[in-house]
């Protein structure tokens, strides 16, 4: 009997133990990352040929204590390597682990290599050569604290390399893990199996090989025992012949079918090639189509299983597409696959929540460094009066109602950008804005008292419903989480895409950026104020302070202003403002752009203007500004400075976003100014629910 070890992915140990016992292994003991077991030479070959779950089959050679590099050298040399190596066999050493003595794995591997080579030269035997790429023998050494474990890797390359996959194409899951996913899916061989996101076909190929009794090692061309002195070629050929016979019989007798699809034609062609190399190509139908085109290939039965490893993302901007994908899959399963089973393997349990399905079973496993979960679902059978599956129905209905009303209004007004939904329903606390054929969902970060998992799932539902109601592709939906912050956080960069979208607002054309910043470059609630400025600007010198991207300057210029002066502290936004002006044919000396601290510039300027627009921050304490600013505290002082620049008969339009702002009318009167509130006149139908989004005033000399 040989003492052996089979390694596997974390989470698959018990499944591997069961498999090895079925092959005839005895004394199986599960440990983290694998199974210790015992077996004769035939079982070694059987486990190499037939294990669908083992990553490697290891034959332990010995252990030694390592307190110095000499201890490692002598411990390795104590093994009788001349009884392990065939004459002329090449080898490679894989060394892992460090301690106070062996601080570099390459150094450890070198000491092991020297010990093995010297074991031959001391007996006046030809020294074996090292071949790091394709050795006849692989020696593994693991150093854990002071103990080194030395073993022979009988697999050679990892057992997940079955020999059928095109190794130029990366696979998101190894074949051994794919086999485990199939085994845990609840699928019964002999029933249909479908993968709607099959990629290179690994799940379907592993399932077909299992169902047709085709050994996973049958197509491998190289093994780790080819240079092993104790290798028994006769027994190996018997094991191999048996596997070939069973494969032919299994394929001839199998009657069910497999279905795979993917949106990438190149990947599908690779899947077909892989299936042909695996010997089961005739059993699998591969098609180029995406999940939106998914339909039941057997609507009249029999029932089968849908299995997949759907994509997931780690970046926020990838979530809308992934949420839409999962939501669509869930609805399609409920509407077309009643009576079927569904099994999905994912690194994102949150995304699986978008299916709107309740799992019957779930399993955990590692996919490389990723913690993953596999969830199995049974899809209830549909009846003639079953309603199509929906998601976030209350929200979807409100969005649909708003769209019907506001879309017509926006078209009549000649605007492409408007707020479609503004936390109309408390449980769906988001804002949804339209920018042409794009949509932006802004979610305020929920308070800590709200369960984060529930809040995230609610957001996923909102995204799925928004895509459905608006009928836009996922790549035209942008998701943002907006903290309730002060100062100039809206100027902080979120991304580096640099993608700009041209939109129309009345007679103006403007650039917006939906992804790179918290705000898009266009404050939608100030739309009417900008139009009013355009109507007031003819023949006037216009000043735009805290100008942001200069959209008010564009409207003033198009309204016939004699000149526009646009002032902002940000070089980025001034360059953006210049692009906006040029887009509308406004350039030259009549349209100045000034980068400056607006408050400092205001105190030093000695020019005169007929119309001034100022939309300062509620509060600012920027390092680049010379002082802090509070709009409630400082607005009278601000008006004092503005009055100095205002020509006789001129007008200041003053707006801010401070809730509960109180205009100091007495303070203005002392300056000889009067204020007329025009807030209600500047609120458009899309902001009718949020009357406090800004306040706006016209200020003139008394």
From Swiss-Prot:
* Entry GO terms, CC: cytoplasm
Thylakoid recorded as keyword: no
| Location(s) in or outside the cell | Cytoplasm
The answer to whether keyword NADP applies is no
Where does this protein chiefly localize?
A: cytoplasm
Classify the source by domain of life.
Bacteria
**What is its EC class?**
transferase
Please give the PROSITE patterns that the UniProt record associates with this protein: THUMP (PS51165), UPF0020 (PS01261)
Q: Where is the THUMP domain?
A: 43-154
Against CDD domains, the record matches this protein to: AdoMet_MTases, THUMP_AdoMetMT
Q: What does this protein do?
A: Specifically methylates the guanine in position 2445 (m2G2445) and the guanine in position 2069 (m7G2069) of 23S rRNA.
Q: What is this protein called?
A: Ribosomal RNA large subunit methyltransferase K/L
- Provenance organism: Salmonella typhimurium (strain LT2 / SGSC1412 / ATCC 700720)
Q: What is the lineage of its organism?
A: Bacteria, Pseudomonadati, Pseudomonadota, Gammaproteobacteria, Enterobacterales
């Amino acid at each position: 009997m040989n003492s052996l070890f089979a390694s596997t992915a974390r989470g698959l140990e018990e499944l591997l133990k069961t498999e090895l016992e079925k092959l005839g292994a005895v004394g199986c003991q599960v440990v983290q990352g694998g199974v210790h077991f015992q077996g004769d030479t035939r079982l070694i070959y059987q486990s190499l040929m037939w294990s669908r779950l083992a990553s490697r089959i290891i034959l332990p050679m010995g252990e030694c204590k390592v307190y110095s590099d000499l201890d490692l050298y002598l411990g390795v040399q104590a093994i009788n390597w001349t009884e392990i190596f065939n004459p002329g066999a090449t080898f490679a050493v894989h060394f892992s682990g460090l301690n106070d003595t062996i601080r570099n794995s390459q150094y450890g591997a070198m000491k092991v290599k020297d010990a093995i080579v010297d074991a031959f030269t001391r007996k006046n035997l030809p020294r074996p050569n090292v071949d790091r790429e394709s050795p006849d023998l692989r020696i593994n050494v693991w150093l854990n604290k002071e103990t080194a474990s030395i073993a022979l890797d009988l697999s050679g390359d990892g057992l997940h390399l079955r020999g059928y996959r095109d190794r130029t194409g990366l696979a998101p899951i190894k074949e051994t893990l794919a086999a485990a996913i199939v085994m845990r899916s609840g699928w019964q061989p002999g029933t249909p199996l479908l993968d709607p996101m099959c990629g290179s076909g690994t799940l379907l190929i592993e399932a077909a090989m299992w169902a047709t009794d085709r050994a996973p090692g049958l197509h491998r061309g190289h093994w780790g025992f080819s240079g092993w002195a104790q290798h028994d070629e006769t027994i190996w050929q018997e094991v191999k012949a048996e596997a070939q016979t069973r494969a032919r019989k299994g394929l001839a007798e199998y009657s069910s079918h497999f279905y795979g699809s993917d949106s990438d034609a190149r990947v599908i062609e690779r899947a077909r090639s892989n299936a042909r190399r695996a010997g089961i190509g005739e059993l699998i139908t591969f098609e180029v189509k995406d999940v939106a085109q998914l339909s039941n290939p057997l609507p009249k039965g029999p029932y089968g299983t849908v299995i997949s490893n759907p994509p997931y993302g780690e970046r926020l901007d990838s979530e809308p597409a992934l949420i839409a994908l999962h939501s669509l899959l869930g609805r399609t399963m409920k509407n077309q696959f009643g009576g079927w089973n569904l099994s999905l393997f994912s690194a994102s349990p949150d995304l699986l929540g978008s299916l709107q399905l309740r799992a019957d079973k779930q399993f955990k496993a590692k996919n490389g460094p990723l913690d993953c979960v596999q969830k199995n679902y049974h899809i209830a059978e549909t009846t003639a009066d079953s309603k199509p599956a929906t998601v976030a129905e209350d929200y979807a209905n409100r969005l649909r109602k708003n769209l019907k009303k506001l879309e017509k209004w926006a078209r009549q007004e000649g605007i492409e950008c408007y707020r479609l939904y503004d936390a109309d329903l408390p449980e769906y606390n988001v804002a949804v804005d339209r920018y042409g054929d794009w949509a932006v969902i802004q979610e305020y970060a929920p308070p800590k008292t709200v369960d984060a998992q529930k809040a995230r799932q609610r957001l996923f539902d909102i995204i799925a419903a928004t895509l459905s109601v608006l009928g836009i592709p996922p790549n035209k939906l942008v998701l943002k989480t907006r903290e309730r912050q002060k100062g100039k956080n809206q100027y902080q960069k979120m991304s580096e895409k640099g993608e700009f979208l041209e939109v129309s607002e009345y007679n103006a054309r403007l650039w917006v950026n939906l992804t790179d910043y918290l705000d898009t470059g266009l404050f939608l609630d100030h739309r009417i104020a900008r139009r009013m400025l355009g109507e007031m600007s003819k023949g006037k010198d216009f000043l735009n302070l805290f100008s942001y991207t200069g959209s008010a300057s564009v409207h003033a210029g198009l309204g016939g202003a004699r000149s526009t002066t646009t002032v902002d502290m940000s070089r980025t936004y001034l360059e953006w403002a210049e692009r906006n002006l040029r887009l509308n044919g406004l350039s030259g000396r009549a349209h100045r752009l000034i980068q400056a601290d607006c408050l400092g510039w205001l105190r030093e300027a000695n020019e005169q203007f007929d119309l001034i627009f100022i939309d300062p921050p509620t509060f600012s304490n920027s390092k680049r500004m010379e002082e802090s600013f509070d709009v409630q505290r400082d607005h009278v002082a601000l008006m004092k400075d503005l009055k100095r620049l205002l020509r006789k008969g001129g007008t200041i339009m003053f707006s801010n976003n401070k809730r509960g702002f109180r205009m100091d009318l007495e303070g203005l009167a002392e300056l000889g100014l009067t204020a007329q509130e025009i807030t209600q006149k500047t609120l458009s139908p899309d902001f009718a629910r949020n009357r406090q989004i800004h306040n706006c005033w016209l200020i003139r000399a008394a």
